[in-house]
Amino acid sequence: MKKCLFPLSVLAVIVATGCGNTSPYANDSYEKHANAPTFTTIDTAGIRIIGQNDTYLLPATNVKKGENMDIRPPAIPMAIIGNSVAQFDGERASIIYPSEKAEVYNIRQMARLLEERSIKFTTKDNQIETDWTNFGAKTDQGETLLRYQINQVGNQEANALVVSVLEAKRDDILFTPSQKEKERYTSSLLNQFIGELNADYRSQAQAVATPTTTGPVQTAIITDGNNHLALAMSSEFQQSWSKLGDALPQLGFETEEETVGRGYRKLNYKPLGATEWARLGVNRPELEDGEYSMQISAHGKQSSVVISDEDGNAISGDAAQAMYRALANLISK
């Protein structure tokens, strides 16, 4: 009996001790009850915001509302032709560039870009006057329409393209644009068109560097936007350049110099005999011998060519008809 009483008494003491010291929460850190952290219930939900400190508050003042600001990027003429100068004189935006670049940047090319945008215009010599268009004023409030004037001026050393606003109307009411508006309108047109001519120049130069496309070329004698007779071709610039280079010598034109990127050739003409023209199926054109030039204009996958005399005047009349028919017969083979 003594052997059984001792273990039972010890077990009773352990059980009693364990029941007397039961904690209301688990304590797995073996801390003493007095040192264990206690938790309290949050009385209010969320975060308590401290009030604003008015120490540095600015005094209230009556501030007058200013005029609405035009946050659009400023439009100024940009000199994006090599060795050029661009400016706005208060009425006109212009870009002045070396005369040797006039075969790329000229009134004919400006007319072509207007045609591509379906902007109607009239032309006389080196001046263009457009019909009403919202070009350059699409972001204005209301319906703003403008009529532009584009001029090409120059001498042996330099040329310039000049853009001005002839008339302006907003919601069918004529108004006089402010100087800032004139600068924005004229600069937008000038920068956009010159930028596109730059892109055309680069694409033509790149096209000539690639292998020539072969295949038949369809042709037609047309009147271009400058009222000049021209030969239209169903071929891209590269193929037209190559075809014309082969055909022109057969008509008596010798190439003195050429600028591929501009689509320009300077030519010297010596008339062929009547027999040679008869073989081409046309009558001999009444053209004087001397200096001429050839200018290709690219129109996407099509192109056109104009031949001009040494004064820059496009050949016309029966002489132009005969010359372009002969060219068409040669390049369509």
From Swiss-Prot:
Ribosomal protein is among the record's keywords: no
Lipid attachment locations (S-diacylglycerol cysteine): 19
Disulphide connectivity of cysteines: none
Principal location listed in the UniProt entry: membrane
Protein topology in the membrane: Lipid-anchor
One GO cellular component term noted in the UniProt record for this chain: cell outer membrane
Alphabetical GO biological process terms: Gram-negative-bacterium-type cell outer membrane assembly; protein insertion into membrane
Subcellular localization(s) per the UniProt record: Cell outer membrane
Signal peptide per UniProt: 1-18
Main function: Part of the outer membrane protein assembly complex, which is involved in assembly and insertion of beta-barrel proteins into the outer membrane.
Subunit-level organization: Part of the Bam complex.
Protein name per UniProt: Outer membrane protein assembly factor BamC
